[in-house]
């Protein structure tokens, strides 16, 4: 058996990121059941960075992650992790109060813009006009290169003398 200060089980993106962080504080062994890391959930990740998605706790984690994703450490990745995207939440014209409630829930700190019915239709011409209300646009939402991010954590773990054990 190998000696380790930390044993992390699961080498998907969550396990790899935890192992990378912990490796700054001691010897880490990262165990993966599959023949390669990221075989399951990481490979099917939605790959969207949004500060408006999910409950308040998830939104707080997203906001806290932005700086790292925008400026990962030198040598962590070969190209930017985030790419341009933006998101649009389309309101129901029969129930405009739901969009109002969402905007209020997100609060003044949310980086969203209220778009008119016409703006939403101009941006997404395939929308049916009769089913489209006003919208909330989040221009800061980004695509995440999940593979590059995952590989950066694994490379960083090895660079900190951590060990990945597959087929464990």
What are these regions (language model features)?
Residues 34-36, 120, 153:
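Short beta-to-alpha linker loops that shape the active-site pocket of alpha/beta-hydrolase fold enzymes
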Residues 10, 32, 91:
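Short beta-strand/turn micro-motifs composed of small residues
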Residues 1-14, 29:
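Beta1/beta-strand and adjacent pyrophosphate-binding region of the FAD-binding site
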Residues 40-46, 127:
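Short, flexible, mixed-charge acidic loops at enzyme active sites
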